[in-house]
Regions:
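Short acidic loop-to-helix transition motifs that present clustered carboxylates
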Residues: 1-6
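Glycine-rich phosphate/nucleotide-binding loop
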Residues: 7-112
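Glycine-rich phosphate/pyrophosphate-binding loop and the adjoining helix
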Residues: 92-97, 101-141
Length: 141
């Protein structure tokens, strides 16, 4: 795992999927996510042959619970990953399309650097960021 961590830092684009234990996967995914700028930017999906579970990559963040300052992007992208998995698993193209639209909305929000949460250098709340993402999504539909 130590060599893998070094390679992630040096050349993260060489990786697509890493198969490892839960503990090492948690460590490596946190490392990779921090390279993007924040734990709040990565989606997380645990998927098997028949079941999948989406969750925020950063965990529950109980230290900021109820303060309206958490970055919602991780959970939103996790939900998009679940829609994509379900769409492909059940051959429902609209679910895959919805996933792609959510991804595009997040990309636009980050490109415009509007309505960012504190972890990304902004001042927006969780609710404000989510509302802005919804508005972007509405314009893409």
């Amino acid at each position: 795992v130590d060599a893998c961590a070094a390679h992630i830092v040096r050349n993260p684009s060489q990786f697509d999927v890493i198969v490892t234990t839960n503990m090492f996967g948690d460590i490596l995914s946190d490392l990779a996510t921090e390279l993007s700028g924040s734990l709040g930017l990565a989606g997380s999906l645990n998927a098997g042959d028949n079941y999948a579970m989406a969750q925020a990559q950063h965990g529950s963040a109980t230290d900021i619970a109820g303060q309206n300052i958490a970055n919602p992007i991780s959970l939103i992208l996790s939900s998009a990953m679940l829609l994509n998995w379900l769409g492909k698993k059940r051959k429902v193209e609209n679910l895959v399309l919805a996933s792609n639209l959510i991804d595009k909305s997040v990309t636009k929000l980050l490109e415009n650097q509007t309505c960012l949460t504190k972890d990304l250098g902004g001042t927006s709340s969780t609710a404000e960021t989510t509302k802005n993402l919804i508005n972007i999504l509405k314009h893409l539909i």
